[in-house]
Amino acid sequence: MYIKPWITLGGLAAVLGLGGCQTLSNTTEKVSDQVTGLFSSKDKAPKIDKDGVVDISKKTLEQLEKFTASMPTQQWVYIENEQLGRYQLKNKAQDGVILTLALHCKISSQRPTFSLSSAEGKPLLKAYDPNAGQIQFLLDNQNYGNPFNVHTDEPLKRFQAAIAQAKVIKIFNASRLYTFQNGNADLLSKPVSCQESGASG
C-alpha cells in the first residue's frame, strides 16, 4: 500500500482491495504510529521504509478493516497490492465516505472510473451506472458535469487536467453533495487498476 498518504474496502473488498502498500508525505511519522497501533504485540506491525511504503498484503481482513478505519482523511492514498495485481487511489472524507478514483489505467483495455462507498463499505455511486441519474463533478466549485462518458473522452481529458490543480472535489448526485479535499493530488497521475471494458460498474 502506498500512502503519500492513501487506501480501500467494499465491505473492504470495495474499499481496500485486500492488501497493499501505502506512501506518506508530511504525515509519515504520524501515520506510521497509527499503523503500529493497529496491531498487537503478538502480531507485529509492518515497517514503513524510507520511501514511505508499507506492505500489508499478508494481514488479516480484520487488520485491514482497522487500517481503513484509521486511514488519513482529506487526502489521496495509493494502495498497492502486488499479490492481487491491484492498484487503487482512495480519498476519505471527514464523514467517512470514500472516493475511489481511477484516471490513468495500467491496462489500456480498461477504462477510467470512480466509485463512492460509505464508511461501512456500502456502495453509494459508481461510474457508468444507467440508474444513477445525473452526476456532477465540481472542482473548486467549477462544474465539469460527468466526465465519465461512454461516448467521448473529451470531458475526461478536461477533468484530468483540472483536477491536478484543484483544492476541493465535490460530487453531486440525487440531492446529495459529497466533498473531498484534494490533498496529495500528485498521486492522481499514478496508473491504477481501472474498470474492465464492458463492465457496468
Task: Please tell me what each predicted stretch does.
Residues 134-201:
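Internal interaction segment
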Residues 8-14:
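Hydrophobic helical h-region of N-terminal Sec-dependent signal peptides
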Residues 127-132:
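Short coil-to-beta strand junction motifs in C2/discoidin
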Residues 22-24:
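Bacterial signal peptide processing site
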Residues 1-8:
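Bacterial N-terminal signal peptides that target proteins for export
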Residues 32-125:
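An ectodomain-focused feature that recognizes extracytoplasmic/extracellular
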Residues 17-20:
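C-terminal motif of bacterial Sec signal peptides marking the signal peptidase cleavage site
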